Structure formats: structure tokens, C-alpha cells
Regions:
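Metallocofactor- and cofactor-centric catalytic cores in central/energy metabolism, strongly enriched
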Residues: 1-187, 195-210
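Helix-rich catalytic cores of soluble enzyme domains
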Residues: 112-324
């Protein structure tokens, strides 16, 4: 018995088939809520059952969309030497993301600023192991309506590896940077050539809100690679048992995946593993727990089961202090 491999694969083949069967049952009988009229129109035009905001999926519809997802793609970088091949036989290391605070050397902390954001870009640029960007810190000293444009502009100024988009305005920056039209980017994505990536976050349980719906549609039209990463929390937004939370995550990923493939067949999609559990004393979300890692391993197994690339997070902790 390979102890290391077994620990990284908590599910048996029988378990994987059970998760898949439960997913098909939920998406077929409960469906998923899509809060965008445009998204529901796309589903209805393609023969999906739509009732109110809920869309229902047959096994054939899910399998057809899944089969069209690209199994490998090239993530283009502004520096051609930084371009990377994404496939089932390699892994890529990128930045963490979404931190609102910066910790100082004296262990105090402050709200992240524009300077912190640019410094984090420079650090990522200098590290050869880092291949892709993700917004490490969000500058709080900018109006919210300007933050995404500022972040994308400075990403292009200070980073020549693979870009991470922050919102819809990022597409315009990519078109200018690479001298391409949106249609050209879409066609190239179908051929496995991609100019950026973004994360799409469904809301547990079983909702893709209007912002994320519209974002997924626009990104698919532009051929942007998407990490579909819901964040079910066992015990609060998801059932308390780990298998149930895993099934819910699987439903949300596959249903969102279908939408992307209806728009651009072959559009690159990665299986995001972000499920976690709740601290039942405080009801807060716990991301550094053993349960979170088990769910992450199981999610990666499901991705391989569906022959999809996956994305996960490492180095997470719920410690109240740092040890530097």
C-alpha cells in the first residue's frame, strides 16, 4: 500500500461514482439557480428546462458539455518565455489571493494599499517558481469602482507572466496588450490558446448570482480560462457531512461549466476545490482544517474522474498569529 498516495486519494472508485450519481440527481430534480436573464435565455435556447430562475440538467446535457471542455491549453504570457502549457501531466504554482490586510515586521497589520499591491506584483515577478498571478492583496485606498482597472493596469506594467483578470474591464486591457479582438481571442481559446484566467465563484447552495453569471458569459465569449470555484462550508452553507458538501460543490461546478460550453465549446475550465468546514463554536469558516484538505484532495480526485484540470489552495492556516 502506498500510504502517501492513499492519503491523497480519500475516495474509492465506488465513492466517485456515488458522488457523480448524486450530482446528476440533484441537477436533474432540484436544478440550480441562475440569476441572470441572459444566462437563462442561453439555457432555454439550447433546450434546457427552465422554471423561474432554476435551470434543470439531464445527464446527456452535462456529459455533452463536459466532453467539449479542453483537456489542455496554452496560457500565453506577455514574455513568451513565461508562457505555460496546462495539462493533466504538470502542475503550475501561482500566487494566493484576496487578502485585505498586510502584516508588518512588528506583527501589527494594516489595510492593504496601492503600494502593497505593486510590491506584491514585484515579488511575484521576481520569483521563478511563480508562473501565474492572483490578486494577493486588494488596495483599500482606492474607490471600489476604480480598483479593478488600477490592479489590471499595474499587473501589465509590473508583471510579464500569465495574467489574472479581475473583472470585465480586464478584457479590454488584454485586447490592447496583445493586439487582438475579442472574437480572435474566442476562436483561439477553442484551439487551446488562452490569454488570461479568472475565477468564477458560485454561491452555495446552488446559485450563480447575476454578477458571476454575466462575468462567466463575457469571459467565455472572450475565451478566458475559468477556474470554477464554489466555497461550500460544511455545517453552514452546505450539509455538515463532508461527502454532502463535496456533492454540492460538484453540482455547482458542473452546472456552471455547462453554461461556459454553450457559449464557447472548448473554452478552458478548471475544477476549483475550495470547500471547507465551519467551526461549530463560532460558525466561522475554517480553511486550515484537516477537513478542508480532505475535501480538496477529494475535489482533485473528482477532477481527474472527469478528466479535467483542477485548482487548489495550499499553505492555508487558521492560526491567530504568525511564526516569522
Amino acid at each position: 500500500m502506498n500510504t502517501v498516495i492513499d492519503r491523497l486519494q480519500p475516495l474509492t472508485i465506488d465513492d466517485l461514482n456515488k458522488v457523480d450519481a448524486a450530482t446528476l440527481d440533484i441537477l436533474g430534480n432540484t436544478g440550480m439557480c441562475f440569476e441572470s436573464k441572459e444566462a437563462r435565455k442561453i439555457f432555454k435556447t439550447n433546450g434546457f428546462k427552465v422554471e423561474g430562475k432554476n435551470v434543470f440538467f439531464t445527464e446527456t446535457q452535462i456529459r455533452t458539455a463536459h466532453e467539449s471542455v479542453s483537456k489542455k491549453w496554452t496560457l500565453m504570457a506577455r514574455d513568451p518565455d513565461r508562457t505555460i502549457e496546462m495539462n493533466m501531466d504538470r502542475y503550475s504554482i501561482g500566487m494566493g489571493g484576496g487578502s485585505p490586510f498586510m502584516v508588518n515586521a512588528d506583527r501589527t497589520y494594516h489595510a492593504a494599499t496601492r503600494k502593497d499591491y505593486i510590491n506584491s506584483l514585484k515579488i511575484a515577478q521576481s520569483l521563478d517558481a511563480i508562473e501565474t498571478w492572483r490578486v494577493l492583496v486588494i488596495p483599500n485606498d482606492l474607490p471600489a469602482e476604480n480598483a479593478n482597472m488600477y490592479m489590471m493596469f499595474n499587473q501589465i506594467m509590473h508583471f510579464n507572466k500569465v495574467y489574472a483578470l479581475t473583472d470585465e474591464t480586464s478584457i479590454d486591457f488584454l485586447k490592447i496588450t496583445y493586439g487582438l479582438t475579442e472574437k480572435e481571442m474566442q476562436v483561439q481559446a477553442s484551439e487551446g490558446i488562452v490569454y488570461g484566467q479568472i475565477t468564477i465563484n458560485p454561491i452555495t447552495p446552488l446559485v450563480l448570482d447575476k454578477t458571476m453569471c454575466d462575468r462567466a458569459i463575457l469571459m467565455a465569449k472572450a475565451g478566458i480560462a475559468m477556474n470554477i470555484a464554489p466555497m461550500p462550508v460544511a455545517g453552514t452553507t452546505a450539509p455538515v457531512t463532508l461527502p454532502s458538501a463535496l456533492i454540492l460543490q460538484n453540482c455547482e461546478i458542473l452546472a456552471t461549466l455547462v453554461l461556459t460550453q454553450l457559449i464557447t465549446p472548448g473554452c478552458p475550465v478548471a475544477y476549483g476545490t475550495m470547500a471547507s468546514n465551519a467551526d461549530m463554536r463560532t460558525m466561522g469558516c475554517v480553511y486550515g482544517s484537516p477537513e478542508s484538505r480532505i475535501l480538496e484532495y477529494a475535489g482533485a480526485q473528482l477532477a481527474r474522474f472527469y478528466n479535467m484540470l483542477s485548482r487548489g489552495d495550499v499553505g492555508l492556516t487558521d492560526s491567530m498569529t504568525s511564526d516569522f
